[in-house]
Amino acid sequence: MNEQLINRTMAFAGILQAIAQVQHLARHGELDNAELAASLNTILVTNPDNTADVYQDKIVLQKGYKLILNQLGDSSQKDVEITRYLVGVLALERKLVRSNSGLGMLAERINQVNRQLHHFAITDEQVIANLASIYSDIISNLGPKIQISGNPVCLQRPIIQQKIRALLLAAMRSAVLWRQLGGKRRHLVFARKAIVDTAKKSLTL
């Protein structure tokens, strides 16, 4: 398999996995802590030696590959809401990479969170609040806000709002990596088969 395509598909799986977690949280108000940690940890790996270093929880990544099969394959399980969130994340990513000040602030704030992890777990409410504020302060204002649908009772809870923003930041991190690896929106139309085939093979590794 083409190594660049493998890495790009891995990053795309990371985007979809974080987006699916946003959807699940918005609907049900809860998320497995290990899965939450796996997505949030990707934000903090800013200088990886290789793409696999960003996605260290392979079980969670498998879910991302399955989402690729659903969203880009011939499956009847395409989720319009996931597609809408994906379009929103990719649009904000384009705005972010064109903003030198935004990228600089992002790196600085992520370093602050890394220091905070000397004292707290990444799923601690204080850390999640900081990650959420990074998204609100730097990303959210770059373009149209992503409108999250779900259970109003869940969406009114501050901790759920913060987890959703933190997960959107994780989706953004994977989107930036996907673009750095050569990912383009047109690939999702014209190179779907190659992406789906790579996801299938990655699932069986």
Swiss-Prot record:
A Pfam family recorded for this sequence: DUF489
Keyword Membrane in annotation: yes
Keyword Transmembrane helix part of the UniProt annotation: no
A cellular component term, taken from the record's GO annotations: plasma membrane
Record key words, sorted: Cell inner membrane, Cell membrane, Cytoplasm, Membrane
Membrane topology type: Peripheral membrane protein
Stored InterPro entries: HflD, HflD-like_sf
Location relative to the cell: Cytoplasm; Cell inner membrane
Family annotation (HAMAP family): HflD_protein
Family the entry assigns: Belongs to the HflD family.
Name of the protein described by the UniProt record: High frequency lysogenization protein HflD homolog
